[in-house]
A protein has these predicted regions:
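A short gly/proline-enriched turn/hairpin at secondary-structure junctions
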Residues: 26-37
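Conserved acetyl-CoA pyrophosphate-binding loop and the N-cap/start of the following alpha-helix
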Residues: 96, 100-108
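Conserved active-site alpha-helix within GNAT-family acetyltransferase domains
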Residues: 103, 126-144
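Acetyl-CoA-dependent GNAT
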Residues: 36-87, 93-95
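Conserved GNAT acetyl-CoA-binding A-motif
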Residues: 113-126
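Conserved N-terminal entry element of GNAT/NAT acetyltransferase domains
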Residues: 1-14, 18, 27-29, 141, ...
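C-terminal "cap" of GNAT-fold acetyltransferases
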Residues: 127-128, 145-156
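Hydrophobic alpha-helical core bundles mediating ligand binding, dimerization, or RNAP-core interactions
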Residues: 16-24, 43-47
Length: 156
């Protein structure tokens, strides 16, 4: 499988809308409300903030499987001003889970963050989310945990 990072255009935000609205895909997000409504009128401001004016504090890309010609997920990170850390985000469309895309996406995200000068990448994952194991297999370690989340980190 050949997976490539794609910097989406504004008119391609419908894939992100589809990801966030899909119940199976967003089931991991149950602790924070599940699916996320993301109507088209919000796209431009979000796009300007994340893609155009990222100020090297935000990174966002689609994962494209070139073999099948489909987007399979998204990867991102952003600098959290409250905790003073870079937080990762990866979402794989439910029908593509269990096929290795998350491993590839996580490695591409870490490589991109490192190239952009990020030294440590974190992710706060719901305590009952099975993806914790995947992050640990990909070099993340537990930083701390609460009753709600496990904070994982990887030194890049």
């Amino acid at each position: 499988m050949k997976v490539k990072l794609i910097k989406p255009k504004l008119d391609e935000m419908s894939f992100r809308q589809k990801l966030l609205a899909d119940e199976d895909t967003m089931s991991y997000n149950h602790a924070w409300g599940g699916t996320i409504e993301w109507p088209q009128y919000k796209w431009k401001d979000w796009y300007d903030y994340w893609i155009i004016n990222h100020r090297n504090q935000r990174f966002y890309r689609y994962l494209l499987d070139e073999d099948i010609g489909e987007y399979v997920g998204e990867i991102a990170y952003h600098y959290d001003n409250v905790h003073k850390i870079n937080l990762a985000n990866i979402i794989i469309l439910a029908r593509f889970r269990g096929k290795g895309y998350c491993n590839i996406g996580l490695n591409l995200l870490c490589d991109s963050a490192k190239q952009n000068g990020v030294a440590i990448l974190y992710d706060d994952i719901a305590i009952d989310n099975p993806s914790i194991t995947l992050f640990l297999r990909n070099g993340f370690t537990e930083d701390y945990r609460t009753t709600e989340i496990i904070m994982l980190k990887k030194i890049l």
